[in-house]
Structures are given as C-alpha cells and as structure tokens.
Amino acid sequence: MSNKIIIAIDGTSSTGKSTLAKRLAKKLKYLYIDSGAMYRALTLYAIQNKYISKSHFDSQKLIEDIPNIHIDFQYNQQNNNYEVHLNNNSVEKHIRSLKVSNLVSQIATVGELRKHMVKVQHFLGSKNGVIMDGRDIGTVVFPNAEIKFYLDASLELRAKRRYKELIEANYKISFYEVLSNIKLR
C-alpha cells in the first residue's frame, strides 16, 4: 500500500498554481497534472476542428467528438516536465496562445464537457501520488483531497505573471491585451 496522496492546488487564473504544483511534484516525485492545460487542449482541438472561433461555438459537435479526444500527460526528459498531450501529440507550446486563452472559458462552461473532463481528472487522480492544479480542483474535482491549497493575487500581478510567460514563449502581445484577457477570466 502506498502512502502517496492527492494534493489539490486551486485558485484564480495566473496566480502561480502550476509553478507551485510543478515544484512540489518534482520534490515529492509525484505525478503533476495541470487541469487548466486539459481544458486548453480541448479548446485547441475545438479550434483545429473549427468548432469554435470568436464568432461561433458548436458545442454539440465537440460533445459528439469526445470519444475521439484523448488528453493525458507524459514526462519529457529533455525539459524535466510533464507535458499535456492531445491524441498522442505534445501540445504544450500551442495551448498557451492568446487565441486559446480567449476561447477556453467558453469550453469550460459547457456542462457535458465539464463532466467529461472531471471524469478524466478523477481517472488520472486515481493513481497514487498526484498533484493537480486548476480552478475547482479542491472544491469540485477532489473535495476530499488530503491536502488543499488556494492561491489568489491581484489582477495586475496575475497579468504581469501571464505576460512574462507569454513573452518568454515568444508571443507578440501587449501587457494590456493580457490584462484584458485576465479580467475576462
């Protein structure tokens, strides 16, 4: 029997949930799962299949496609991190774009999609020694997690964190675009 537990890190967007979770997972040698990345991967799938754009969202088509969508996390030895994979392809670099950021909240509000994602998160969390971060992780997904954290920060600090992350990933974007996006989320 394993002594490893589920650790849930919850909070508002761009507060450092993933940074804390990754560091803690490395230190404890736990599996790290970024639930926000899962929703971003689902959003990327919807964009690639033209189910969603700024002007339309065909949630029914996306729901019908659920059996064809496989999201998981695989360890990348080169960068010493777990990366989100969509249908066996790493999409880590693609899911952080502003386009995905601007559409992910629409995906997350569809009840049937949320139910499916929670089911996948429960499956991933059933493995011993998991640290999962994201909104609602400690309240909805794993309300009985052995350890739970909640992170929050000012709007400006959250925008600064996200802006720095995007600039480091070579996205061409202004701070005010990021700030506006964070306000919406």
PLM feature spans:
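Phosphate-binding P-loop
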Residues: 1-4
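Walker A (P-loop) phosphate-binding loop of P-loop NTPases
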Residues: 14
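Post-Walker A helix-loop "phosphate-sensing" segment adjacent to the P-loop in P-loop NTPases
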Residues: 25-34, 48-53
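ATP-dependent small-molecule kinase phosphotransfer cores
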Residues: 38-129, 156, 160, 168, ...
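Hydrophobic anchor at the beta1->P-loop junction of P-loop NTPases
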Residues: 7-9
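Walker A/P-loop
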Residues: 18
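Short, well-ordered beta-strand core segments
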Residues: 130, 146-150
